[in-house]
Amino acid sequence: MAVSVLDPGRRAWCAEALGYEFRDESLLLEALTHTTYANEHPRARANERLEFLGDSVLGMVIAAHLYERYPDLPEGELTKIRAAVVCEPSLAERARVLGIGRHMRFGRGEAVSGRDRDSTLSDAFEAVVGALYLDGGLEAAQRFVLRELGQLVEAARQGLVRVDYKTQLQEQLQRQGAAAPQYRLLVEEGPAHLRRFQVGVYFEGRLLGTGWGRNKKEAEQEAARQALMPEHHSG
């Protein structure tokens, strides 16, 4: 049984931009509801749980697509491509193209400043994926994800999509109220024309990750990427 809760404007936008008609429209409305709105309207549900689900569905869809599309690429390369495709700036940009921010519900203090914030839009994109998965199953979510992000996959493989892992790590720590991480050169080896550097990234004296590179900047980016891996910051 269809659950109709969307206003005509959001319903028309959904059909045109998302290319999907929800059986349970409350799922899409939840995906478009920011925490600040839910705090002011106790009966509304914020999109955080759908974001949690959508993040996993999105990662799985892209991982499976990469596995099938590039059978000869090693795990490390597949991981880098996936990271470039599902990173916050990439998802936020697709959300802008789709107009997701214009149809979100915000609290009074967040409506102006939050509507175009990368983190907000990226989270909402993931929440929409979660809503599609619950309403239409994996096929609906997969169709949407590959339609919106499929072109980015090849661009990322060719190195045309760059991920600034240092900025991502710093922003993640800042959202937790923490100071910026510190980078230290650990190893410098090899002849001048084949120099290799190993850098460690530290937070409050604790090593978060290490990375090798042909120069210090490259090594710092790899160290930050390692620090962002789930096994490095799950605690």
Curated annotation (Swiss-Prot):
Alphabetic keyword roster: Cytoplasm, Endonuclease, Hydrolase, Magnesium, Metal-binding, mRNA processing, Nuclease, RNA-binding, rRNA processing, rRNA-binding, tRNA processing
This protein's name: Ribonuclease 3
Family: Belongs to the ribonuclease III family.
Keyword Ribonucleoprotein tagged: no
Cited SUPFAM superfamilies: dsRNA-binding domain-like, RNase III domain-like
E.C. code: 3.1.26.3
Gene3D superfamilies: 3.30.160.20, Ribonuclease III domain
Reactions listed under catalytic activity: Endonucleolytic cleavage to 5'-phosphomonoester
Active-site residue numbers: 55, 126
GO biological process, one term: rRNA processing
Database matches in InterPro entries: dsRBD_dom, RNase_III, RNase_III_dom, RNase_III_sf
Keyword RNA-binding found: yes
Annotated organism of origin: Symbiobacterium thermophilum (strain DSM 24528 / JCM 14929 / IAM 14863 / T)
CDD domains assigned: DSRM_RNAse_III_family, RIBOc
GO CC terms: cytoplasm
GO molecular function, one term: double-stranded RNA binding
Enzyme's top EC category: hydrolase
